[in-house]
């Protein structure tokens, strides 16, 4: 099984998402973060479940979508995936770490 490593950038994104939603509803904020984490967990059994990120031309940088959020990840090897960032579709796409 593949290990998921949430990079600091992705953890920061989760906190920002939580804080933004929690301004209206802490219950829904917790629910949204839980859904994002559950969606990412499918990568443990299928690293290639996501599609290639259109902003980058690499088979190893992929995304899975949950609602308006794109979970961007990099396949490091057959045992490790880095979750790089969580991107809301309405926002400008940031540069990825090299």
Describe the role of every protein-language-model region.
Residues 1-56, 60:
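Basic, Lys/Arg-enriched alpha-helical interface segments
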Residues 48-78:
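Basic/aromatic recognition patch in beta-strand/loop cores that engages polyanionic ligands
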Residues 66, 74-98:
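Enriched for short, Lys/Arg-rich terminal
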């Amino acid at each position: 099984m593949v290990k998921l490593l949430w990079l600091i950038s992705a953890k920061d994104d989760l906190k920002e998402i939580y804080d933004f939603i929690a301004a209206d509803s802490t219950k829904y904020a917790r629910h949204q973060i839980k859904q994002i984490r559950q969606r990412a967990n499918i990568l443990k059994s299928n690293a290639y479940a996501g599609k290639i990120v259109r902003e980058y031309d690499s088979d190893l940088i992929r995304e899975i979508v949950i609602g308006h959020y794109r979970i961007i990840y990099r396949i490091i090897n057959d045992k490790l995936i880095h979750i790089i960032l969580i991107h809301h579709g309405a926002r400008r796409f940031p540069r990825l770490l090299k």
